[in-house]
Curated annotation (Swiss-Prot):
Pfam families: ATP-synt_ab (PF00006), ATP-synt_ab_N (PF02874), ATP-synt_VA_C (PF22919). This is ATP synthase subunit beta, chloroplastic. It comes from the Eukaryota. It is a peripheral membrane protein. The keyword Membrane applies. NCBIfam families: atpD (TIGR01039). The modification Phosphothreonine is found at T6. GO terms for cellular component: chloroplast thylakoid membrane; mitochondrion; proton-transporting ATP synthase complex. The gene is atpB. CDD domains: ATP-synt_F1_beta_C, ATP-synt_F1_beta_N, F1-ATPase_beta_CD. Belongs to the ATPase alpha/beta chains family.
Amino acid sequence: MRINPTTSDPQVSIREKKNLGRIAQIIGPVLDVAFPPGKMPNIYNALVVKGRDTLGQEINVTCEVQQLLGNNRVRAIAMSATEGLKRGMDVIDMGNPLSVPVGGATLGRIFNVLGEPVDNLGPVDTGTTSPIHKSAPAFIQLDTKLSIFETGIKVVDLLAPYRRGGKIGLFGGAGVGKTVLIMELINNIAKAHGGVSVFGGVGERTREGNDLYMEMKESKVINEENLAESKVALVYGQMNEPPGARMRVGLTALTMAEYFRDVNKQDVLLFIDNIFRFVQAGSEVSALLGRMPSAVGYQPTLSTEMGSLQERITSTKKGSITSIQAVYVPADDLTDPAPATTFAHLDATTVLSRGLAAKGIYPAVDPLDSTSTMLQPRIVGEEHYETAQQVKQTLQRYKELQDIIAILGLDELSEEDRLTVARARKIERFLSQPFFVAEVFTGSPGKYVGLAETIRGFKLILSGEFDSLPEQAFYLVGNIDEATAKATNLEMESKLKK
């Protein structure tokens, strides 16, 4: 991994004298820059425009070289607004791709695409930066062992387990608990795996980014008193920013995650919200550069751009990056090129259901719609696989019977079906779980449930061991022993009321 020492001002001034160009044309966020013969910058080099606008205010715009046009000209995309720029202004070739701060000092902080802190907490205290453009790890460096990434969340670990170093798609509308699930995963990876997380907000609403930051502070995922104890670094490139920034902010977040994996040898969780906006920004940039559009108006380089990001998210022999990517599906069309290209890279899908959220079952992960390539007997073992399949079959049968129950009532069902419904309702409630990050809202302590405990609990419910217990005993508990203890308490309470 190439790490650059932080550039100091004297070096910049030497570089300014060395390679200086001038703006020849500006069309929105696209700049054409002329350089002296033999001094052309490389593709992806950072260019910096410094000067003053007509009102005398300072301008500092960073761009990235995208095309070499010939006649000693390059075409670059601006990473911030180009207001105030004019033809003839000096442009400095930085000689390297964009580089961003990396390491422990980034935890608890919010950055923009350039790696500049935007949280008003002063400069970042780090002496190391790293370029955002890198090759994916060589095949010989990869860790090819298939291992499960335990999250401590029952429904995920049992029915749609995550792969260590894998990629997971998170599907869900507004208000079904996506943010809380993300924060719980960040909390659990820090506690159980000693890992850290990086959150990349790609082209989403500024308000949502702010809400996430405030909730993270409230739930102590970000520790305001001691930032070094925080568990996450945040990188935002929101909806109002130019397409260049939205296209590169995912790479900025990934670069920070790679440092934790390769240098600190940690397990890292990388969140990208939303991967569709990354594709959308690439499509805008492609159109601005004058490329011929491909299917449905997307960029012709869609698969290449997606692959160059996704192939860097992997497990190596040093550590792993497990990525959870929120996927927006335009017009609910799964055949749209953007989600279709994303699906090719995913190992698991976690689908959040509005129906479960309405019932108050959190996390509202749909046990029948969520899938994982890891749920195979040779990977997870026979016991885990059989238990998961039986749970799914029971829930599927309950789903099929719901219409009959709604019309005729439970009494019209056969004895066997009534037993299936009773167990399915217990399973449905046992798939809920109190979260650590929700303690401040619910008042009940969070629970981390190991995989072995999860399997044991569901096996006991399926075997009929707890057919006599009330279903509310299984709601919002950790392992199965807590459910039996809760049942005893409920029984004592009902006796006292009598």
